[in-house]
Amino acid sequence: MEDFVRQCFNPMIVELAEKAMKEYGENLKIETNKFAAICTHLEVCFMYSDFHFINEQGESIIVELDDPNALLKHRFEIIEGRDRTMAWTVVNSICNTTGAEKPKFLPDLYDYKENRFIEIGVTRREVHIYYLEKANKIKSEKTHIHIFSFTGEEMATKADYTLDEESRARIKTRLFTIRQEMASRGLWDSFRQSERGEETIEERFEITGTMRRLADQSLPPNFSCLENFRAYVDGFEPNGYIEGKLSQMSKEVNARIEPFLKTTPRPIRLPDGPPCSQRSKFLLMDALKLSIEDPSHEGEGIPLYDAIKCMRTFFGWKEPYVVKPHEKGINPNYLLSWKQVLAELQDIENEEKIPRTKNMKKTSQLKWALGENMAPEKVDFDDCKDISDLKQYDSDEPELRSLSSWIQNEFNKACELTDSIWIELDEIGEDVAPIEHIASMRRNYFTAEVSHCRATEYIMKGVYINTALLNASCAAMDDFQLIPMISKCRTKEGRRKTNLYGFIIKGRSHLRNDTDVVNFVSMEFSLTDPRLEPHKWEKYCVLEIGDMLLRSAIGQVSRPMFLYVRTNGTSKIKMKWGMEMRRCLLQSLQQIESMIEAESSVKEKDMTKEFFENKSETWPIGESPKGVEEGSIGKVCRTLLAKSVFNSLYASPQLEGFSAESRKLLLIVQALRDNLEPGTFDLGGLYEAIEECLINDPWVLLNASWFNSFLTHALR
């Protein structure tokens, strides 16, 4: 094939084709069919332009080369065949002088008579398939497309063929001659089959063998092969499609497509009512830790041993009393439960050998707090199906709650840095491939940004608590086991540290199904006075249990220490997901990675290092009433992580529904910003679906508030 090309085409065309292949890193010794295709395309472009001039009156005329008037202005500017830089320079120059719209892709010619760019196509397949591929790639009505085939067929935009019939006939004759010459040398079949279709930036993978057969078998009806289906999809024009489908539907379906304009969307309505309350399974920003550094005590690593050691570091215990009662609970029972924990821990310390686990005495206060014997008796359905007034429990609608500022404060705090390191880098062996090296580099940079983050502390705390609770639920089903709430970290200097946040007492846990509930009482230390935001602590009974000496700028100050006590519950499936909270790190790393990939594809090199080390650059973090908030790349990493962690901590059906429904509105708004002229029907129904998820969940309400800020700024 290479010999044929060199014999068949003008040496100048061959040289230009060689340069083009070199520029794109292709080997003409291997890609011989591509070499022939490039030469053919170049020759057609030159023949298209040949002999066509514009005279002084601005009329298009045809002049043979030996004519003395050949100094007239050329009708066509040839862009194909130039190196990319020069080609774009020519295109920019044409756009500046003629006011033509700049094309996204390099065209082949510019027609000074019709004032338009022209894309020339030469295909070995059917012209309409290739035309659709070209049109789909270019996506511009301003660029004129003209396709020729080796069989003498042609196709052009709006059937406007630009040239006179004789000029086009010369091109078709030349293509037919090339085909005949190839066929006589036995090259045509290989050349015809090698055409891969119009490639966009995403190169088409070759599908062969079994996969190809499966692809052909998996098509919708009326399509014989994958190529035909691909051409149909590429050339599919969505405008009017939905309207057409709607007109075929039942007459009861009454959907008119309304244009979605900047003035169309309204803010999401947030519910009114009392402020929402804290519903996480453990305290977040309000938690207090009793800690030991460099633990080396006997039984170190056994939770109960660690907990007792941490309790011994505090000397300010005092007679506990209730400072913020639980509105609906029997508050003396919560107080008695804490006193029982203290007493039973003291009993353990008095024993010669501390046990590995501690089962609490089943006192009346714990039975009440853990709902022992409170569940209604289950009766077999067959025994009661004949009862005439058998009905399901009446359940009250949940009370609507309004957004409260504490949840935004919780989120801000989760994004902050602590003075401890919460995750270690695993040893995963040497990198082998370059992609592994890039992956390791990204992971290391990301870990450095989030290892001190408070959201990472919440991950490790959640993993520990859920693991311990699930283990105890399976190992001690009938016992009221005392479970210390522990986490481990390192100080900035690298010293190990064990922290105690408080205790959990679990109730009976015969968990057969994933959704069966185990009740537990949580008792957590804090320095936060609950009387400052009583609505946040609606579900808690809060005791004052001691005084803590804290170092401050004015010396040591004494602050009251509180214990936040509440009854709570969880299930096997929730504990399973809680144990896997480390996935949040992976999710946020992937989001950062997609930002790096976008940057890298623009710059055409891996931008990981620059991305993390360019400290001067700021990135969008999120929306607030003030506008788009920006911050360092580290802040972006920590914010994305905190969002992922809060999605786990505050997981609920309300969040699932809001995320799914608001995403639809988000996509419509983004389409509007991208000037895609979106249309909608039943927008009111979409708002209804979004707003029915806004009931009382603090995290969902905060997300809805953020969404409203986004709407305000996106549609300015």
Swiss-Prot record:
Q: Which Pfam families match?
A: Flu_PA
Q: Where is this motif: Nuclear localization signal 1 (NLS1)?
A: 124-139
* Localization: Host cytoplasm; Host nucleus
Note the SS bond partners: none
Major enzyme class: hydrolase
Chief place where the protein resides: host cell
Q: Which InterPro entries match?
A: INFV_PA, PA/PA-X, PA/PA-X_sf
Q: What is its EC number?
A: 3.1.-.-
Post-translational modification summary for this protein: Phosphorylated on serines and threonines by host kinases, including human casein kinase II.
One Gene Ontology molecular-function label: endonuclease activity
Ligand binding (Mn(2+) 1): 41, 108, 119-120
Role description = Plays an essential role in viral RNA transcription and replication by forming the heterotrimeric polymerase complex together with PB1 and PB2 subunits. The complex transcribes viral mRNAs by using a unique mechanism called cap-snatching. It consists in the hijacking and cleavage of host capped pre-mRNAs. These short capped RNAs are then used as primers for viral mRNAs. The PB2 subunit is responsible for the binding of the 5' cap of cellular pre-mRNAs which are subsequently cleaved after 10-13 nucleotides by the PA subunit that carries the endonuclease activity.
The entry's protein name is Polymerase acidic protein
| Source species of the chain | Influenza A virus (strain A/Malaysia:Malaya/302/1954 H1N1)
